[in-house]
């Protein structure tokens, strides 16, 4: 399945989550596109709930179905809770860390920065959004990209940086200083539904 590249607000309204990070797409019409109002939602089956939860998380991180399932399978080989390990692996993606550092306003924009070669890991350019960042690795903006307008605009509006990452706005350098706790990740996601979905 290809990655969705259409308007994010449509997906946000359909799934009931904000992909922009602002929540504005849900303020005026907090129901799926095509519906005439919030009372038009049909009763969802257990399978439907599980599938919807999977889609929420997949679109939140902007992954294809194959990428999503591969990461899920990788998480299953780790010690600990499958669902929590899955969430943490998603959070360790390079494009997500770039987003968490405030270098991009959305994960989609962060993925473009990585794809276009604006980001380095431990001093080496990495253009693979799915690259798994390890604790202690240094993420930086390339010197040639330091004046990138998209990065500058994002830094102007970004204020919250999670405790598990550190960022120096002067040097445009950050790092993953520890793995995140589940309580620090998306509270609106019930990863148990996703584990159940793939266990069917």
Curated annotation (Swiss-Prot):
One of its GO terms (cellular component) is small ribosomal subunit. HAMAP family: Ribosomal_uS4_B (MF_01306_B). One of its GO terms (biological process) is translation. GO terms for molecular function: rRNA binding; structural constituent of ribosome. Keywords: Ribonucleoprotein, Ribosomal protein, RNA-binding, rRNA-binding. Belongs to the universal ribosomal protein uS4 family. Part of the 30S ribosomal subunit. Contacts protein S5. The interaction surface between S4 and S5 is involved in control of translational fidelity. One of the primary rRNA binding proteins, it binds directly to 16S rRNA where it nucleates assembly of the body of the 30S subunit. The gene is rpsD. InterPro entries: Ribosomal_uS4, Ribosomal_uS4_bac-type, Ribosomal_uS4_CS, Ribosomal_uS4_N, S4_RNA-bd, S4_RNA-bd_sf. It comes from the Bacteria. Residues 22-43 are annotated as: Disordered. Pfam families: Ribosomal_S4, S4. Residues 92-170 form the S4 RNA-binding domain. This is Small ribosomal subunit protein uS4. The keyword Ribonucleoprotein applies.
């Amino acid at each position: 399945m290809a990655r969705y590249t259409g308007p994010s607000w449509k997906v946000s309204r359909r799934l009931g989550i904000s992909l922009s990070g602002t929540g504005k797409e849900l303020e005026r019409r907090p129901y799926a596109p095509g519906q005439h109002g919030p009372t038009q939602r049909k009763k969802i089956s257990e399978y439907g709930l599980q599938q919807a939860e999977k889609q929420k998380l997949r679109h939140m991180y902007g992954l294809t179905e194959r990428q999503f399932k591969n990461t899920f399978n990788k998480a299953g080989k780790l010690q600990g809770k499958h669902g929590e390990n899955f969430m943490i692996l998603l959070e360790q993606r390079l494009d997500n860390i770039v987003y968490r550092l405030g270098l991009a306003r959305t994960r989609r924009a962060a993925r473009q920065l990585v794809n276009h070669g604006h980001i380095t890991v431990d001093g080496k350019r990495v253009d693979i959004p799915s690259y798994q960042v390890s604790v202690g690795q240094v993420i930086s903006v390339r010197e040639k990209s330091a004046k990138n307008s998209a990065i500058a605009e994002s830094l102007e509006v970004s204020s919250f940086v999670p405790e598990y990452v550190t960022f120096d706005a002067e040097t445009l350098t950050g790092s993953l200083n520890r793995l995140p706790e589940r309580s620090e990740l998306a509270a609106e996601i019930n990863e148990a539904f996703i584990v159940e979905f793939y266990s069917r």
